[in-house]
């Protein structure tokens, strides 16, 4: 399938970083005998992957800014374009050898995400979206699920990290949603949760206190698959607030309504 030059640049970078992570994943089990070994190793794997992404993206688009989870912000001469990158979304899964993690690359132009790539090297699933051109998984067009009854829906969420977030608020939200849906899941990688909504595997997803690199690529993925994404508490931009809820138009609206009442 033919994609734009920008998408090809993103895919090439994601695949190269993915090969690095896949090699590192194979080493994790050998480090489990050491308490500090695996965590330190994963930190290095994360940084290696980000540096690969930075090198490849900067070479192809030298003026663009770069925001990465590990290295922070690197200013570019082109102030209108910025890469927003998570080199390893699902770090805890990776640390435990669970193959639910991803590389997430979003391209923002003047505040709007215009392209996204999410790649899970463990199963070679490559999600691609470009503004106005649709969303794809391994070249197959994606559409969000069409269910219109919450009691038929499977929904994913994220858990607040230890020492961060409002755990009581989350418990209220989880209880309110759990009482209304067919199933509730927690997979541990925000970018893939968003991608799963785009692919129709999940009907909806919500999570609070995310960072831009968690959301950027997944947000355009859901929208290009026909879904709706917003802040939880307002119709605003989740990329700005860090609080995301999504699904098809109906599911998004119902989830947002329940979550706002529970907050």
Where are these regions (language model features)?
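Small-residue (primarily alanine) positions within well-ordered alpha-helices
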Residues: 10, 14-17, 116, 135, ...
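N-terminal subdomain of lithium-sensitive/metallo-dependent phosphomonoesterases centered on the IMPase/IPPase/PAP
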Residues: 1-88, 250, 257, 261
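An extended, acidic
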Residues: 143-263
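Short, solvent-exposed loop/turn motifs
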Residues: 113, 141-143
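DPxDG-like acidic metal-binding loop motif
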Residues: 77-136
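Residue-level signal for inorganic ion chemistry
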Residues: 21, 46, 57, 91, ...
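Solvent-exposed alpha-helices and their adjacent loops that cap or buttress functional pockets
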Residues: 34, 75-77, 110, 128, ...
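Generic detector of well-ordered alpha-helical packing
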Residues: 47, 51, 70, 87-90, ...
């Amino acid at each position: 399938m033919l994609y734009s030059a920008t998408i090809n640049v993103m895919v090439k970078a994601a695949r190269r970083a993915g090969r690095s992570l896949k090699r590192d994943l194979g080493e994790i089990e050998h480090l489990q005998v050491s308490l500090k070994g695996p965590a330190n190793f994963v930190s290095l794997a994360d940084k290696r992957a980000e540096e690969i992404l930075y090198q490849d993206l900067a070479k192809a688009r030298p003026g663009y800014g770069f925001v990465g989870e590990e290295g922070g912000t690197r200013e570019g001469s082109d102030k209108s374009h910025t890469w927003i990158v998570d080199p390893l979304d699902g770090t805890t899964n990776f640390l435990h050898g669970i193959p639910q993690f991803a590389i997430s690359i979003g391209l923002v132009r003047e505040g709007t995400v215009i392209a996204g790539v999410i790649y899970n090297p463990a199963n070679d699933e490559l999600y691609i979206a470009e503004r106005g051109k649709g969303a794809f998984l391994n070249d197959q067009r994606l559409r969000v699920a069409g269910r219109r009854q919450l009691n038929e829906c499977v929904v994913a969420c994220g858990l607040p990290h230890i020492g961060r977030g409002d755990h009581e608020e989350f418990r209220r939200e989880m209880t309110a949603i759990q009482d209304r849906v067919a199933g509730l899941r927690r997979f541990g990688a925000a970018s893939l949760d968003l991608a799963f909504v785009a692919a129709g595997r999940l009907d909806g997803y919500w999570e609070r206190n995310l960072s831009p690199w968690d959301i950027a690529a997944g947000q355009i993925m859901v929208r290009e698959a026909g879904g709706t994404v917003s802040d939880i508490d307002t119709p605003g931009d989740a990329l700005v607030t860090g609080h995301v809820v999504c699904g098809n138009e109906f599911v998004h609206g119902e989830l947002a309504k329940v979550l706002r009442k529970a907050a």
